[in-house]
Design a protein with these regions (language model features):
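Amphipathic alpha-helical polymerization modules
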Residues: 1-257
């Protein structure tokens, strides 16, 4: 009976975390460049039950009765990096990455991060920045140096070679970083990542006046969320039944005494 209690409790903890992941996905359905997370679960190590009470010719005969699992546990949360659809904004400071890779952005402390969200703006100093205030990094085509993209009061135009020309100013190429293994990326915020050992992206094109939408499967997430709630409630009922039975047993033992 207690094993059933442990199994239901572990399942509820797992379901609670799954619901948290699903809720966060749904909350970011309109977040540009957001990538859907999925909770991966696995079973606890199975225990083998055996019986030593079976005797043959007076000698104990060890007999395996089968396996026993104590439920599931959280293994990892993985991110689906499938590309989202493109949304036309007709805003010249919006950019969408078509293909693999991430815009390289830098915070005020000089730390590099990576994002698929190209909804940029020009700050009071004239630099192209993210909505979070991170500098958008590019390669200056005149000096070949990596630096924050400076726009000033000029107009931006992106050509077919992904080169960003600033009216009356410099030309840049966005620093597009990619990774050999996306599993090493960590979400800093919902659509910004940190990662080690980036490589130069070369399998992409950029669309000006567009944004990449979230890749969350809305219908699938709602369906899974409803199923998770049902499973959670079913485990609650199991625990309530076990609790009621244990109380009854304790009461009967007390009355015998």
């Amino acid at each position: 009976m207690l094993r059933g209690l442990y199994t239901s409790v572990s399942s509820m903890l797992n379901l609670q975390e799954r619901q948290s992941v699903l809720t966060n996905n749904l909350a970011n359905i309109k977040t540009n460049g957001y990538k859907e997370d999925t909770l991966i679960s696995k079973s606890f190590d199975e225990m083998t039950l055996s019986n030593n009470d079976n005797y043959k010719n007076g000698i104990p005969n060890h007999q395996n009765l089968g396996g026993l699992s104590f439920g599931t546990k959280i293994d990892e949360v993985i991110t689906n990096f499938k590309q989202g659809s493109f949304i036309s904004t007709e805003n010249n400071s919006d950019f969408a990455l078509n293909g693999s890779g991430f815009f390289q952005v830098r915070d005020h402390d000089g730390n590099m991060f990576y994002s698929r969200d190209g909804s940029f703006k020009i700050n009071s100093q004239g630099y192209l920045v993210t909505n979070g205030g991170y500098n958008v990094m590019g390669t200056n085509q005149a000096s070949n140096s990596t630096e924050p993209i400076y726009v000033g009061n000029g107009k931006m135009a992106l050509n077919s070679s992904n080169e960003l020309t600033i009216e009356g100013g410099n030309s840049y190429k966005f620093n597009i970083a990619d990774f050999n293994d996306y599993k090493g990326l960590k979400k800093v915020v919902d659509n910004v990542y940190s990662g080690e050992n980036p490589v130069n992206g070369d399998k992409y094109s950029i669309k000006q006046g567009f944004l990449e939408s979230s890749n969350v499967d809305y219908i699938g997430s709602i369906t899974e969320s409803m199923q998770t709630i049902k499973e959670f409630e079913a485990n609650q009922k199991v625990i309530q039944t076990i609790d009621s039975t244990l109380k009854q047993i304790a009461s009967e033992i007390g009355s015998v005494r």
